[in-house]
Design a protein with these regions (language model features):
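Outer-membrane beta-barrel domain signature
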Residues: 70-73
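Short S/T/G/P-rich N-terminal loop/turn motif that feeds into the first structured element of a domain
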Residues: 1-64, 75-93
């Protein structure tokens, strides 16, 4: 299962803030498991991250940790949208 997280950026030092975001992503990967890819620079928003998780429970936990850590560090990323995508096996069981 993947989660596509799109964020906008309202700061003035994207490169430095991305380093901090990388630390958050590493923390999530070690605490929750799975893998986070990105950042990507999509057409619709400033940034795109792709979260790979193996269980539905991890989906909410990864998201809560991601947004809580961003708020704690006062990073100027603003949530745009997120989308969950599953494989047929995950959907049908």
């Amino acid at each position: 299962m993947i989660i596509l997280v799109r964020l906008d950026y309202e700061g003035d030092d994207l490169q430095n803030d991305l380093k901090k975001m990388s630390e958050i992503n590493s923390k999530i990967e070690s605490k929750i498991g799975g893998k986070i890819e990105g950042p990507f620079f999509p057409q619709q928003s400033t940034l795109l991250f792709i979260f790979h998780v193996d269980k539905y429970e991890r989906l909410n936990e990864a998201g809560r940790t991601f947004y809580a850590e961003m708020a704690k560090l006062k990073l100027p990323f603003v949530p745009d949208t997120y989308e969950v995508a599953v494989t047929p096996e995950e959907f049908f069981g």
